[in-house]
Amino acid sequence: VPQEVMLFGGTISDNIASGNPAASKESIYEAAKKANALEFIESFPETFDTLVGERGVKLSGGQRQRIAIARAILKDPSILILDEATSSLDSESENLVQAALNELMKNRTTIIIAHRLSTIREVDCIYVLEDGEIVEKGSHDELALMEDGLYYNLLYNQLSNA
């Protein structure tokens, strides 16, 4: 799930189903529900048949992210890569997207690329990179206690700027 989601011209249903072209309408619906996308999809008069992309409805960043998450849920990958998946979202959208990501990450290996440390607090293991090298490794709680560590300093700076 990338930072900037690309939707192609077509329906919302088509965009979600690109994760699994053989998917049934029921599985597309369930994926949208798990991705916290159902409420906004059902607010459109044509619901899942609403056109998006260049000639269709303009979706917000959070809505596009949730379509991408629904697509990934439908694809059901064994390894998931999240590249700054919540970085450009407002707080309300971030909470909805984060809840959807938590659902998506269940029972699978997930690699998260993140600068916003609040998005990785609950992960099993954090690898901190500096100049392309791993400089720290541990849980959020472990790294947050290392006062001379890079993670600690990043966390401190983010919390003091919040």
Predicted regions and their residues:
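Catalytic Walker B motif of ABC-type/P-loop ATPase nucleotide-binding domains
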Residues: L80-D83
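ABC ATPase nucleotide-binding domain helical subdomain, centered on the C-loop/LSGGQ "ABC signature"
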Residues: S13-E54, Q98, N107, L145
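A short, proline-enriched helix->beta-strand linker immediately N-terminal to the Walker B motif
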Residues: L74-S78, N107
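Hydrophobic anchor residue at the start of the ABC signature
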Residues: I69, I113
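Conserved D-loop/post-Walker B switch-helix segment of ABC ATPase nucleotide-binding domains
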Residues: D90-A100
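ABC-fold ATPase nucleotide-binding domain signature/coupling loops
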Residues: L38-I67, L89, S160-A162
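C-terminal portion of ABC ATPase nucleotide-binding domains
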Residues: K34, S43, A99, R116, ...
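Conserved catalytic loops of ABC-family nucleotide-binding domains
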Residues: E103-I112, I120
